[in-house]
Amino acid sequence: MSETPPYHESFEHKSRYQLEDLARKRIQNYVASTVLKRRSFGKIQESKAIVAFSFGDSAEVNKDLAELISSEVSGFDIPLYLQQEIASHMPESEHIAIENQSYQTTKDVAAVVLKNIGEQSVTVVAQAFHAQRCIDTCNEIGLDVVALRVVNRFPSNDPQPWVRSEVNWIIKESHRDTYTGYEISDKYKLS
């Protein structure tokens, strides 16, 4: 039985990804210096609010995030701040939908919560590979992340190519300070 190779070995020159040397180096540095995937931790009851970050535009993972919230949060009297792609799957729940007609960044979503509750403790709900950035962003703006709940899936048919697989996500995240997700998807032919 063969083991899965480390992520950085998935980006070798002969792969389907057409990456120049600088891009491969950037990816290797990102993989070596970043927490790629998080697991759930902490006690929800220690937070003053729950903030749920969507993952992609499709229903696939966002519906799973909504179901996770429904199963994990029932019984707690804690305000729910849900990004619109998750909120649409929870019409019966009492929540605050974080809506916007244009693309919302992780920081945009966290900023709405901060504006509403101030510097308080929160539980983050996110996709496992997106979770570290959600935690870092919340902490950077003054929200104290005391708990995390995750879904570990990728939406294979999402309109955003960078969320369709672990490899696509890592390529995008390793270049996020220089290109948008759409630019990275086009440049490296993410599918």
Name what the model sees in each region.
Residues 156-191:
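C-terminal capping/extension of enzyme domains
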Residues 5-170:
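A structural signal for short, hydrophobic/glycine-enriched beta-strand patches
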